[in-house]
Amino acid sequence: MAKPPRPRRAQREQSRALRKQVRRTERLANELPGGSPDHPIDVASAAIVEGKARGTPCIQCGGDLELRGDRATATARGVLREIALACRRCHAPRTLWFRVAPVAAN
């Protein structure tokens, strides 16, 4: 007859499984639009960036994101903005990328 796992062992296994799930979720989030500089979210104006960033839910818990900082870099295809955010509920850091490229007039 096998003994049931000790409480500490079960806790470690659960903790390991949660960390693995967080890493998998973060890896998938980097492939979403805005998750990396290679896949930025295109916007027409810089005024829209902060509102869109704050309106994005946390990838881990679905909570509201709080702006921590931003940085802009000029590229040939427009201005690339990196927005650093943190979740208000779980404090998970998140970086979103936006490309400010004004729409060309006809």
Q: Each PLM stretch: what is its role?
A:
Residues 1-51, 98-106:
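Short, intrinsically disordered terminal segments enriched in charged and Pro/Gly residues
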Residues 54-55, 80, 84:
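Residues immediately within or flanking Cys/His clusters that coordinate Zn2+
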Residues 58-61, 87-90:
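Short cysteine-rich clusters marking metal-coordination/redox-active sites
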Residues 64-65, 94:
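Cys/His-rich microdomains that often coordinate metals
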Residues 68-71, 97-99:
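Short Cys/His-rich "knuckle" micro-motifs
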Residues 71-82:
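Short linker/helix segments within small regulatory modules
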Residues 78, 91-93:
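Coil-to-beta-strand transition motifs
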Residues 84-86, 99:
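Residue-level recognition of well-ordered beta-strand positions that form the cores
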